[in-house]
Amino acid sequence: MRSWIKTALWLGAVLPAGTALAASDTEAAEDRLRPEERPQQAHDTAGSLALASLTTIRPMARKSIAPAAQDALAPAREADADANAGFQRWITAFKIRAQTQGIGAATLRAAFNGVIYDASVIKRDRNQSEFTKTIWDYLDSAASESRVRNGTKALDAHRNTLERIEKHFGVDKEIVVAVWGLESSYGSFRGDMDIIRSLATLAYDGRRGAFFEEQLIAALKIIEAGDVDPRTMTGSWAGAMGHTQFIPTSYLDYAVDFTGDGKRDIWSDTPTDALASTAAYLKAFGWVTGQPWGIEVVLPRSFDFTLANRKIQKSPREWADLGVRATDGRPIKDHGVASILLPAGGTGAAFMIFKNFSVLERYNTADAYVIGVGHLSDRLKGGDKIKGSWPRGDRALTFTERKELQERLTRAGFSTEGIDGRIGPKTIAAVRAYQSAKGLMPDGYASLSLLEKLR
């Protein structure tokens, strides 16, 4: 939730032109799907949510190592020991800061009992996968037959609860289940990392220290409130928690007690509070009851691709006047103003997206993620697969290639206003400008063929 809820770029996310997604170095992508996020103008925020089985509170002890290997590992052990010594000094100072924000001494003692520096968390945080997967590969997994089948079972198993949630918050039960399916594979991968240890390690590390210290304070407030014991407060390495992966600040702002037991328990094997909290979160960000997230459309041959821009909104009737139709050839019903989205350029599937698309972006800003949630929810309602074709002969640009594309566009006079390897609105605008200047289809698609033209 831009929550992934509040800041999901904390997982280092960004979706290149809605085309490619960073490959996960953690959980199996088939089970838990969080793509790289699309950069935004001035936010480092997204959602909040996690994975894995809720069993291990502390990392398992290292296996014994042959004597010959012990000497080779000695420098690493010394580095870990040095890091932990500094970490413990940081914790001492942090506890003083935490107490000034209302965290009690008893909570601090319980939360930090036995907590040591976790080098594995920093390794994951530092990992920047060079290789990416295309949006069509991501969607193949997001709405795979097994995920649809398991989602249907989850809907049936929790139908009464989901119908009450839908009635109370006005958010489609299939949307809630689709988020659940992508975030933790319907609760199968909720995360087994110690949240306090992970957040403290990340806050101490300093790369995004202020953000993670804020999350750590929020996590301690959750413990202070009695919603969870620190030893069962588990989640992802980056601090996302529960069935639908809330980060601590988002939990404080949006989690709800839907069972009425006095706790907002998103960690329980019973997903009621987590699912209701997801609906509450989406409602808080303006979910429009009865409005689709988006609808697949067919564009006329004469379509002006410069109109496929998030800043350009028209009513479905106005789009129909321009020849835009549903895949069955009919005009789209009036669900409010909408934009046209081409996540893989003019040769891929096209979508008419409504306000609820932007609401889902509060969970994760990547186009692929939002389409994944939306399409999975449609499949859970009995809808069809995406009918449009994808340029499956293409491959996604690597991180290095994305930076090269930005560099070459900028040198050619089409500034991307930064070279970061993240294909966001400014880079897409530069791509469009270049395409228009060269007489190419101005669809904003950052492809390998475009890069080759720039070389």
For each of these PLM feature ranges, what is it?
Residues M1-D25:
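Sec-dependent N-terminal signal peptides
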Residues L21-A85, A106, K385-S389:
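Proline-rich, low-complexity linker regions of envelope-associated factors in Gram-negative bacteria
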Residues A22-S24, L405-R408:
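Non-catalytic peripheral regions of nucleotide-handling enzymes
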Residues Q70-A79, I91-F94, D137-V148:
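Acidic/histidine-rich, surface-exposed loop or edge segments in extracytoplasmic proteins
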Residues E78-A110, G114-Y117:
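Mature N-terminal segment immediately following signal peptide/propeptide cleavage
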Residues W90-F94, T161, S198, S277, ...:
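A general alpha-helix detector
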Residues I103-H335, G348-F351, F357-F399, G421, ...:
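Catalytic glycan-binding domains that act on GlcNAc-containing polysaccharides
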Residues L397-R402, T410-L454:
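Short acidic, glycine/serine/threonine-rich helix-capping segments at coil-helix boundaries
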